[in-house]
Amino acid sequence: MALDKLLEQEAQSEIERIRAEARDRSQMIVAQAQERAQALIESRQRALETQRQAGIVRARSAADLDLNAARLTASESGMSQVYELVNQQITEITRVPEYRDILGRLIYQAREVITDAEAVEVNPAEAALARELVHDIAVRENPAIQGGVRVVARGGKSGITNTLAGRLERVRGELAPQVSRLLAE
């Protein structure tokens, strides 16, 4: 019986050793699985956070673009209104007494450029005034000319138009930043 007991104890020891190894191995497998799971969770959280941050950046960029587009639209609308108002003022300025001096300067400046001028063209409403200012060449009526003068030479093949609206248009690009700044204030 002692041999049976000895064999039984030995078998029991072997079983306990195998169980202990299995327990250790299973704990190690579980720990590794938990580490991998935790690493995967952290990786996914980082990826989600990165996506969230990218989404925030995209949303901010889209909002900035929308805001800038709205500002640009408002600025363009304001600029259009300003230039429309200025053009109305230019039309009205032709009716004030000081316009005689303005038209005289416009004619003089255009004739400085076209030295061999044959005629001065003005709006029919300004023809009488132009005839008072120009005595050495013909004054013709041209309904297309508004608030200024066109001086022609060489049978109409050469000429220059010098109008208030034309001058405004030439400096419009230079004035745009200043007008925009004033509108923004």
Curated annotation (Swiss-Prot):
<dbReference type="GO" id="GO:0033178">
    <property type="term" value="C:proton-transporting two-sector ATPase complex, catalytic domain"/>
</dbReference>
<dbReference type="GO" id="GO:0042777">
    <property type="term" value="P:proton motive force-driven plasma membrane ATP synthesis"/>
</dbReference>
<protein>
    <recommendedName>
        <fullName>V-type proton ATPase subunit E</fullName>
    </recommendedName>
</protein>
<dbReference type="GO" id="GO:0046961">
    <property type="term" value="F:proton-transporting ATPase activity, rotational mechanism"/>
</dbReference>
<dbReference type="InterPro" id="IPR038495">
    <property type="entry name" value="ATPase_E_C"/>
</dbReference>
<keyword id="KW-0066">ATP synthesis</keyword>
<keyword id="KW-0375">Hydrogen ion transport</keyword>
<keyword id="KW-0406">Ion transport</keyword>
<dbReference type="InterPro" id="IPR002842">
    <property type="entry name" value="ATPase_V1_Esu"/>
</dbReference>
<comment type="similarity">
    <text>Belongs to the V-ATPase E subunit family.</text>
</comment>
<comment type="function">
    <text>Produces ATP from ADP in the presence of a proton gradient across the membrane.</text>
</comment>
<dbReference type="GO" id="GO:0046933">
    <property type="term" value="F:proton-transporting ATP synthase activity, rotational mechanism"/>
</dbReference>
<dbReference type="Pfam" id="PF01991">
    <property type="entry name" value="vATP-synt_E"/>
</dbReference>
<dbReference type="GO" id="GO:0005524">
    <property type="term" value="F:ATP binding"/>
</dbReference>
<keyword id="KW-0813">Transport</keyword>
